[in-house]
């Protein structure tokens, strides 16, 4: 079960959270991930609905105690780019990074991959190289508020000042395990009643 038993939470639908549960399967086994998923469902304040910002808005409105959301959406709301209402809501909540005494917080990623047999391999590699350039990484940090992937590019000040950087990230779980465990993740989430 969830570590904050008795707290009502809001979270997106099961499809959106498959990578999170897949990482739990990889690290803790399918049985433990199934129990965790049951704990999530039993603590849901409502049936999953809306995007990450809707989860944060629900906590700010007192509809739930905890929201599971990607932090870059909180920073986006704090920026005011999504309007005064969302900015005000974001100021009412605080980010919390779970699993700090173990492998660290699960991190979703934005990624690019080259398809085997791609007809324009050189251009595809050039695109990936560009995405990893300081120019592109600064775009990600300043416009989507994601964490940069390369040294020399700093996170957006909204992230640094409001979310902090002093947390342990799960850098040990191989991202490839997310794909490998997707079917099992959906299976345990569905069995738990996670819509």
For each feature predicted by the language model, list its residue ranges.
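Short secondary-structure boundary segments
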Residues: 12-13, 71-72, 143-144
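Soluble non-cytosolic domains of exported or imported proteins
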Residues: 15, 31, 50-53, 68, ...
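Sec-exported extracytoplasmic/periplasmic mature domains
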Residues: 25-30, 42-45, 60, 64, ...
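Mature extracytoplasmic/periplasmic domains
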Residues: 110-170
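Extracellular/periplasmic bilobal clamshell ligand-binding domains
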Residues: 157-195
């Amino acid at each position: 079960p969830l570590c904050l038993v008795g707290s009502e939470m809001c979270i997106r639908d099961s499809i959106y959270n498959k990578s999170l549960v897949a990482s739990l399967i990889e690290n803790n086994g399918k049985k433990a991930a199934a129990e965790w998923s049951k704990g999530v469902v039993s603590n849901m304040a409502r049936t999953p609905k809306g995007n990450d910002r809707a989860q944060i808005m629900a906590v700010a409105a007192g509809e739930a105690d905890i929201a599971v959301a990607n932090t870059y959406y909180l920073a986006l709301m704090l920026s005011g780019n999504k309007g005064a209402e969302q900015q005000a809501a974001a100021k009412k909540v605080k980010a919390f990074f779970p699993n700090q005494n173990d492998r660290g917080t699960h991190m979703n990623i934005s990624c690019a991959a080259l398809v085997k047999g791609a007809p324009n391999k050189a251009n595809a590699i050039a695109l990936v190289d560009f995405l990893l350039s300081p120019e592109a990484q600064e775009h990600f940090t300043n416009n989507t508020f994601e964490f940069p992937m390369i040294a020399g590019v700093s996170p957006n000040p909204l992230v640094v000042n409001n979310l902090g950087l002093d947390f342990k990230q799960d850098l040990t779980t191989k991202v490839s395990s997310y794909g490998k465990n997707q079917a099992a993740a959906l299976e345990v989430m569905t069995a738990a009643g996670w819509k």
